[in-house]
Amino acid sequence: MPPPIGYCPAVGFGGRHERSDAELLAAHVAGDRYAFDQLFRRHHRQLHRLARLTSRTSEDADDALQDAMLSAHRGAGSFRYDAAVSSWLHRIVVNACLDRLRRAKAHPTAPLEDVYPVADRTAQVETAIAVQRALMRLPVEQRAAVVAVDMQGYSIADTARMLGVAEGTVKSRCARARARLARLLGYLNTGVNIRR
């Protein structure tokens, strides 16, 4: 059934402002079938990047993101509005990635091919691959913390809420992850300071 005449998924009936994340989530819960799609599209790029950084392969990232969005779609009614909707979505994505990593660890498989792409000739691509490999060598909990804080820009407090741990735990996980990354990537010697 097409939407009613005069209805725009982005603004509802004749409104001139873009709906906030909280308004979109509330509209979804109230039955607006376009609201969740708009919310997902708004955050897709950042959520996919987070999933890719937290997963072993791009396929795992895609699957985890799909799992996360299905969970968010189904569980939207339980959102308490005590945090930003984007933080809630990020927490769901991180949890979906961690769940997949735990399942893979419990049921290891031998890869049929190298999971990392062949580096092309640019130093930027080589560095990105080296960083990705180093991230994959971190324990899952450390990786999730350092990706959220150092790569996604979340505060310690927001990361603690997303991961469901104490702020001190996030700080120690980040410190351990940074120290290990410095050892693993020290050969790059790019002169870039690791954020502390």
Swiss-Prot record:
Keywords: DNA-binding, Sigma factor, Transcription, Transcription regulation. GO terms for biological process: DNA-templated transcription initiation; positive regulation of DNA-templated transcription; regulation of DNA-templated transcription; response to water; response to xenobiotic stimulus. SUPFAM superfamilies: Sigma2 domain of RNA polymerase sigma factors, Sigma3 and sigma4 domains of RNA polymerase sigma factors. It holds the Pfam family Sigma70_r2. GO terms for cellular component: plasma membrane. Sigma factors are initiation factors that promote the attachment of RNA polymerase to specific initiation sites and are then released. Extracytoplasmic function (ECF) sigma factors are held in an inactive form by an anti-sigma factor (RsaM, AC L7N5D7) until released by regulated intramembrane proteolysis. This sigma factor is required for the synthesis of surface or secreted molecules. Disulfide bonds: none annotated. The keyword DNA-binding applies. Interacts transiently with the RNA polymerase catalytic core formed by RpoA, RpoB, RpoC and RpoZ (2 alpha, 1 beta, 1 beta' and 1 omega subunit) to form the RNA polymerase holoenzyme that can initiate transcription. Interacts (via sigma-70 factor domain-4) with anti-sigma-M factor RsmA (AC L7N5D7). A motif (Polymerase core binding) lies at residues 63-66. Residues 156-175 bind DNA. One of its GO terms (molecular function) is sigma factor activity. Transmembrane segments: none annotated. Was identified as a high-confidence drug target. Extracytoplasmic function (ECF) sigma factors are held in an inactive form by an anti-sigma factor until released by regulated intramembrane proteolysis (RIP). RIP occurs when an extracytoplasmic signal triggers a concerted proteolytic cascade to transmit information and elicit cellular responses. The membrane-spanning anti-sigma factor is first cut extracytoplasmically (site-1 protease, S1P), then within the membrane itself (site-2 protease, S2P, Rip1), while cytoplasmic proteases finish degrading the regulatory protein, liberating SigM. NCBIfam families: PRK09643.1, sigma70-ECF. Residues 39-105 are annotated as: Sigma-70 factor domain-2. PANTHER family: ECF RNA POLYMERASE SIGMA FACTOR SIGM, RNA POLYMERASE ECF-TYPE SIGMA FACTO. This is ECF RNA polymerase sigma factor SigM.
